[in-house]
């Protein structure tokens, strides 16, 4: 049974029993007990300071790399609004740096850099999602990861206090950053360099072409389902056990890239999670290797 929540007064927006499937790339998932979109960082800080401490908080980015279970999410689900989408130049004696709000789409950062002749962040065009989500999981593609370009990060803790971390403080590892306690990233400074518009454009086009040829980008999918292992790509192991194209309910392993799970139109979150767990079991039974989810799974499990 869900806990009754006493909500602080805020300047942002609350919605109760909000349908979360509309915000995820899989287009599945239940409702949020309370959905909150803060007006700005001050509003978010005030909310955190005044929300009873035992209430669960879940933060959403763009809804990629995410599976929300059918029974939904208790507590408060937070999605950063437009005030967290700003991109600005930062003065620095040693680097070219841009300040980016955590709610900004990775694609929009890549586009901004193209417009301003800034190189080094082209890989972001190949990573669906927001900057905040990318930092939280040290997202990467095409030979780069967030740890390679993050200079510093601003965040709020569970009590609404603001912290600034240098990249080294975030303990970046493969597909994760390790920090103590609950944090909501609000802004980051990213390192880039001067480059020609032609060079940047060519790199962006190459990445986008590769994505279109190798990933099911026009289907309902959340990106790579599993982390690669030390010795094998996840797709190689899935292919090895013969699960390319395999289905459970409306969920299917992509024929194009078998580390992508897709919703064929009528899948439930349970279909997708069960298909993923079947993959993990089969890979372990045949190879002794445990695949770890790269997709973040949140929400209440079915009884």
From Swiss-Prot:
Pathway: Cell wall biogenesis; peptidoglycan biosynthesis. Its cofactor is FAD. It is an enzyme of class 1 (oxidoreductase). One of its GO terms (cellular component) is cytosol. Its EC number is 1.3.1.98. Keywords: Cell cycle, Cell division, Cell shape, Cell wall biogenesis/degradation, Cytoplasm, FAD, Flavoprotein, NADP, Oxidoreductase, Peptidoglycan synthesis. One of its GO terms (molecular function) is FAD binding. The keyword Oxidoreductase applies. It is found in: Cytoplasm. GO terms for biological process: cell division; cell wall organization; peptidoglycan biosynthetic process; regulation of cell shape. InterPro entries: FAD-bd_PCMH, FAD-bd_PCMH-like_sf, FAD-bd_PCMH_sub1, FAD-bd_PCMH_sub2, MurB, MurB_C, MurB_C_sf, Oxid_FAD_bind_N. Residues 27-207 form the FAD-binding PCMH-type domain. It catalyses: UDP-N-acetyl-alpha-D-muramate + NADP(+) = UDP-N-acetyl-3-O-(1-carboxyvinyl)-alpha-D-glucosamine + NADPH + H(+). PROSITE patterns: FAD_PCMH. The active site is at residues 175, 224, 294. Belongs to the MurB family. Cell wall formation. HAMAP family: MurB (MF_00037). PANTHER family: UDP-N-ACETYLENOLPYRUVOYLGLUCOSAMINE REDUCTASE. This is UDP-N-acetylenolpyruvoylglucosamine reductase.
């Amino acid at each position: 049974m869900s806990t009754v929540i006493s909500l602080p007064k805020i300047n942002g927006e609350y919605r109760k029993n909000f349908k979360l499937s509309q915000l995820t790339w899989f287009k599945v998932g239940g409702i949020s007990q309370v959905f909150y979109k803060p007006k700005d960082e001050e509003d978010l800080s005030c909310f955190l300071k005044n929300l009873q401490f035992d209430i669960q908080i879940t933060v959403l980015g763009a809804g990629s790399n995410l599976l929300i279970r059918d029974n939904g999410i208790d507590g408060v689900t937070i999605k950063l609004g437009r005030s967290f989408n700003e991109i600005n130049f930062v003065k620095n004696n040693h680097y070219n740096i841009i300040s980016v709000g955590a709610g900004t789409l990775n694609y929009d950062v890549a586009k901004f850099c193209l417009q301003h002749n800034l190189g080094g962040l082209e890989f972001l065009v190949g990573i669906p999602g927001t900057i905040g989500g990318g930092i939280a999981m040290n997202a990467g593609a095409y030979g780069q990861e967030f740890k390679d370009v993050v200079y510093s990060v601003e965040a709020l803790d569970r009590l609404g206090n603001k912290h600034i971390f240098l990249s080294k403080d975030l303990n970046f590892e493969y597909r994760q950053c390790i920090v103590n306690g609950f944090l909501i990233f609000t802004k980051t400074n990213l390192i880039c360099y001067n480059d020609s518009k032609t060079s940047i454009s060519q790199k962006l086009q190459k990445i986008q072409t590769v994505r279109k040829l190798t990933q099911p980008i026009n289907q309902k999918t959340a990106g790579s389902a599993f982390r690669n292992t030390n010795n094998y790509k996840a797709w190689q192991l899935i292919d090895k056990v013969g699960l390319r194209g395999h289905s459970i309910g409306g969920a299917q392993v992509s024929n194009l890239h078998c580390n992508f799970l897709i919703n064929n139109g009528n899948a439930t979150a349970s279909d997708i999670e069960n298909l993923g767990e079947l993959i993990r079991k089969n890979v372990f039974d045949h190879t002794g290797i445990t695949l770890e989810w790269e997709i973040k799974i949140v929400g209440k499990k079915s009884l």
